[in-house]
From Swiss-Prot:
The chain crosses the membrane at residues 351-371, 392-412, 436-456, 473-493, 623-643, 667-687. It holds the Pfam family EXS. PROSITE patterns: EXS (PS51380), SPX (PS51382). GO terms for cellular component: plasma membrane. It comes from Arabidopsis thaliana. Residues 1-298 form the SPX domain. Expressed in root tips, vascular cylinders of roots and filaments, leaf hydathodes, stem, receptacle and stigma apex. This is Phosphate transporter PHO1 homolog 7. Residues 557-750 form the EXS domain. PANTHER family: PHOSPHATE TRANSPORTER PHO1 HOMOLOG 7-RELATED, XENOTROPIC AND POLYTROPIC RETROVIRUS RECEPTOR 1-RELATED. Residues 1-350, 413-435, 494-622, 688-750 are cytoplasmic. It is a multi-pass membrane protein. Keywords: Cell membrane, Membrane, Phosphate transport, Transmembrane, Transmembrane helix, Transport.
Length: 750
């Protein structure tokens, strides 16, 4: 792989603007090379004619590239100056510039200096942030040590007037002299009988920290939300229990893991940019026939980017502290927790995915041929089948289609370097790849299609009439299996992803009692495109709960309870998004969230009116449903394109946005048109547009499938826009809450 591609591949996506513009510098070098080739062409004949004289030595000259060149001669000088902001800036002067490519060479070094200044400035600012964060972590660990002493020795009573020594060997290791207590400036004395071998410390000084701290509630609950609304304190009094100690240690462990991850990213940032400068200077020397790489790299080696060892020191301190206090002095265990987990692609996943794809395609073909050969659509009872069994099996079709769209999203997010694991907040190394999602989707598809074929075959075979009840229960068995896998407590079938999904679903249901994060409103938006699937779930409860499956009859529509929940189930996803927007409006004071809430409120009204029209076919209901559906559709379409995707901005080029990840602009225009067309398809149920050769349930399923496809398209551009926002703010790390809150005033006084 060429360095340019490898350089881009190893970049931190959110920091890509802060890296060296290697491609831009390379393009300038190509201009220099082109200029030099042009200048050499008129001299080709002259060089040929003078070849024999050169050989005789009569016209011998010493070129700059000759082997006899003096090593002391330099082609460039690099000057370092300090700007008003205190940061160093570098300026390169070319001592001798050839006429050919003069402008390009000057432009090359000017661009190179600007790029290096940018990298150096960014690196220094980030290192300063890390140093400040390390100070905060020192305070947190100071509090942890005091808290641990209090928990480990609850029977002892310490007062500030006493001077008591405690053997710190119970908490810290004597083998590692660079202990946490020493790093944080705690005075440690050796006054044991073993010549100072025992580490002892004045405990009241350490415990005095506890007077200035409170416990932060890092996990939000409905109770904490209510306290915030009532403006009550959301901090806990210190309770010195082993349970609290375990929670604090777990929180600080996560803080250290994230902090170490930042340090690794910064170290990699420094290395990659230094390597990029070295590579581009070697290319310059080769093209321009100069020796500028050595003096320039000497300057780079003296700069803050490569000479600073703050990051290495911090990494060593974090490793030592983490291994000692969070890994039980087991270095291999501690480093395994600190280092990023590389997810390995397994061949059996690819094989299994391909196997189930083949099974699904084969079963679809077999189903079509079976329906055609047995003339099922013209058979007696096919209408009853479409009104009972079809909605049951269509649930799996909706889920499988949505998973396929999500797998496609993951593929294209990875291709265009959208950092979706960071955006969604997945635990490192646990995110599902597109192959895993396809495996699950086609596995479920294969299972559902097998059930459909078995059902139809037994339906048409007179010898299996005694097993009709079992035939009717097939979809229920599949649904029960899916639910059992989803809630399975064992570490199988991607347990971390299942737990994450269920937690986000619960937060969506409990809105607005939880702070709204991107996974919360993203999943709620997915559910708005699965209204028909939710109604199918309601039909499962009605069909099997009330015993209709025994006689294959649908009495659900005649039930007032079913009709009421038919409204409620369709409204739940939109209402959840409405409450999430209200929460963000109050919490963030962002007026755009108010307009977004209005969009979902309009949709709630439209869905209710459309549902009422499906029960009561009257002109008033039809007109009301049509008006509100049209308003919701136009409002939603505008919001999708302008706010969610960030497109159609007038100042931007081509009416899109300033930055686009997909190089082909036509993709964005096609996506806009598709979004509008598929949004309009939502109006069909109000317009009573039906096709004579399609059953009503089939039409509903097709429209629901189109909405799922629209949502899949929306997903890619929504996350692309979110990723570009992170890139603009250089936001590459998640914020991990700290367990302790310091009283700053008391801290300053002390």
């Amino acid at each position: 792989m060429k360095f340019g591609k490898d350089f881009v591949r190893q970049m931190i996506p959110e920091w890509q603007q802060a890296y060296m513009d290697y491609a831009g510098l390379k393009s300038i070098l190509q201009e220099i090379q082109t200029s030099r080739k042009r200048s050499e062409r008129p001299g080709i004949l002259k060089r040929k004619l003078s070849g024999s004289r050169n050989f005789s030595g009569l016209t011998k000259r010493y070129s700059r590239t000759a082997s006899t060149r003096e090593p002391e001669i330099q082609d460039i000088l690099v000057h370092a100056t300090t700007g008003d902001d205190g940061f160093e800036r570098y300026e390169t002067t070319i001592l001798e510039v050839a006429e050919a490519g003069r402008e390009s060479e000057l432009a090359f070094f000017k661009t190179l200096d600007l790029e290096f200044d940018k990298v150096n400035h960014f690196y220094r600012s980030k290192v300063e942030e890390m140093v400040k964060e390390a100070v905060v972590l020192n305070k947190q660990m100071d509090a942890l040590i005091a808290f641990r002493i209090k928990v480990e020795r609850p029977s002892s009573s310490w007062s500030c007037s006493e001077t008591v020594s405690v053997d710190m060997n119970a908490l810290d290791s004597n083998d590692q002299r660079n202990t946490l207590a020493e790093e944080m400036g705690i005075r440690v004395e050796g006054n044991g009988s073993n010549g100072g071998d025992s580490t002892k410390e004045s405990v009241p000084q350490v415990l005095s920290v506890l007077e200035r701290i409170r416990l932060n509630k890092t996990q939000e609950t409905p109770l904490s939300t209510i306290k915030n609304v009532l403006k009550l304190s959301n901090q806990e009094e210190l309770k010195f229990t082993r349970e609290n100690l375990k929670k604090i240690e777990e929180r600080l462990k996560n803080v250290f893991i994230e902090f170490y991850r930042k340090l690794r990213h910064l170290k990699n940032y420094s290395f990659l940019n230094t390597l990029a400068i070295s590579k581009i200077m070697k290319k310059y020397d080769k093209i321009a026939s100069r020796s500028a790489a050595k003096p320039y790299m000497e300057m780079v080696d003296k700069s803050y980017l490569t000479s600073s060892d703050e990051i290495n020191k911090l990494m060593l301190r974090v490793e030592s502290t983490f291994v000692e206090h969070f890994a039980g002095l087991n270095r291999s265990k501690g480093m395994n927790l600190l280092r990023p987990k590389v997810k390995k692609e397994k061949h059996r996943i690819t094989f299994s995915t391909g196997f189930f794809v083949g099974c699904t395609v084969s079963l679809v073909v077999a189903l079509v041929m079976f329906i055609h050969a047995r003339n099922i659509m013209g058979a007696v009872g096919h209408k009853v089948y479409m009104e009972t069994m079809f909605p049951l099996y269509s649930l799996f079709a909706f889920v499988v289609l949505h998973m396929i769209m999500y797998a496609s999203n993951i593929y294209f997010w990875k291709r265009y370097r959208v950092n979706y694991p960071f955006i969604f907040g997945f635990k490192e190394g646990t995110e599902l790849g597109y192959r895993h999602v396809l495996l699950l989707s086609f596995g479920l598809g294969t299972l559902a299609l097998c059930a459909v074929l078995i059902n139809l075959d037994m339906e048409m075979d007179p010898n299996t009439n005694d097993y009709k009840t079992m035939t009717e229960l097939l979809p229920m068995f599949i649904l029960a299996l899916v639910v059992a896998i989803l809630f399975c407590p064992f570490n199988i079938f991607y347990r971390s992803s299942r737990v994450f999904f269920l937690m986000v679903v619960f937060r969506c249901i409990a809105a607005p009692l939880y702070k709204v994060n991107l996974p919360d409103f993203f999943l709620a938006d997915q559910l708005t495109s699965q209204v028909q699937a939710l109604r199918s779930l309601e039909f499962y409860i009605c069909y099997y709960g009330w015993g209709d499956f025994k006689h294959r009859q649908n009495t659900c529509r005649s039930s007032d309870v079913y009709s009421t929940f038919y409204f409620i189930v369709a409204v739940i996803p939109y209402w959840s998004r409405f409450l999430q927007c209200v929460r963000r409006l109050i919490e963030e004071n962002d007026s755009s969230q108010g307009y977004n809430a209005l969009k979902y409120l309009l949709t709630v009204v439209a869905v209710c009116l459309r549902t009422a029209y499906s029960f009561n076919r009257g002109n008033i209901w039809k007109i009301s449903a049509w008006v509100f559906s049209a308003l919701a559709t136009f409002y939603g379409t505008y919001w999708d394109i302008v706010f969610d995707w960030g497109l159609l901005h007038r100042p931007s080029k081509h009416l899109l946005r300033e930055k686009l990840l997909v190089p082909h602009k036509a993709v964005y225009y096609v996506a806009i048109v598709l979004n509008i067309v598929l949004r309009m398809a939502w109006l069909q149920t109000v317009l009573d547009f039906n096709l004579s050769f399609l059953h009503r349930e089939t039409m509903i399923a097709l429209l629901a499938a189109l909405e799922i496809i629209r949502r899949g398209i929306w997903n890619f551009f929504r996350l692309e826009n979110e990723h570009l926002n992170n890139v603009g703010k250089f936001r590459a790390f998640k914020s991990v809450p700290l367990p302790f809150n310091y009283n700053e005033e008391e801290d300053r006084d002390s």
